[in-house]
Amino acid sequence: MKKTISIWAPLRYANVGDDMQAIAFATYIKKLGYNVKLFQLDEELSNLYDLKSVRTVDELCKDVNLVIIAGGALLTPFRWYKRILNKAAREYEADFKDLYLATKKYPSVKFCAISMGGDGKVKKPETWYSHWRIDFFRSESFINGTVRLSGDVEQMKQAFGKNFAYHADMLFRTPEYFEYDLLPKTDKIRVCLQFKKGRYLDKKLLSDIYKYAEDNDDIEFHFITTHMPKIGLTYQYVPNKQSKNIFIDTYKSPRQLLGVLASCDVTITSMLHVGLMGLTVNTPFVSYRGPGKTKSFLKSIGGEWAILPENISFNELREQILIQNKEDLYKQYNQDIISEMIEDSKNQYEFCKTIVEKYS
């Protein structure tokens, strides 16, 4: 009889990065000969990738010895007031309460985070995390795992007393686990745009994009989101309607969104995992008002040129990035470093195999 491995991630938010990490590990573990069940994977994705999904932590922990924590930005810091006032932050910390209580109810079950995300900086846990998150990470049931930013090794050691290893992000192996459907061919330049609302978006830049798309016919602008629309998270910008050169490509599945990214000549995003997904299908990305970790990653691959000025104009963006050849842009990164990261990311999967064989 096959043993079963469980995979936990915050999948109810239907975020493409979390979905892909959980699905990739599930696919890998199934190929090793195990059954797999995932926590709250979207029903359509469950059917598409033939993966079992369960709704509760109890169902996840029953009849297993190991729960893989498949990423998500588990070290995301929240100020105390955000943990009270922000619904998503409250729910996220409540997840850790459920996980911690599960360590008490199922003492034989081990929890292991693989390719876990933070911002690479050491933070005082009591300032940034709920006591449930702290208690879970410090519990004996939560065993040593891996992180995807080297700075988080020290965070896990200092804050939680855990010895984590660093390897490059497991999503570097995306093409091995996900097929995708390309958009119809076109002679136009295709630009993928992922914008956050509010202070993360320059209204003048947006207005100029619309004007250019209306007055010219050489560039298509594809606006993407990283959450499925049915989840109701609306912090990312999408147009009200499509037009001849304005397209709305909200996230439906990894297959669909990877196809959009692969079909574009460049991705403009604030999110590291969106840019990384694009890189794996040979689409260069530039950071627009992105956080420190996105900029740090670009610097690490020789991509200082890809960190856009905060108030870049559309004309500057067009001349410096949009009309440049796709292959030439990609070659501006340090190819040797990217190749090393792709190779090192294999170790995330090898670590997964070792843990599964040891604790299943």
Label for each model-derived stretch:
Residues 1-360:
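Active-site anion-handling motifs in enzyme catalytic cores
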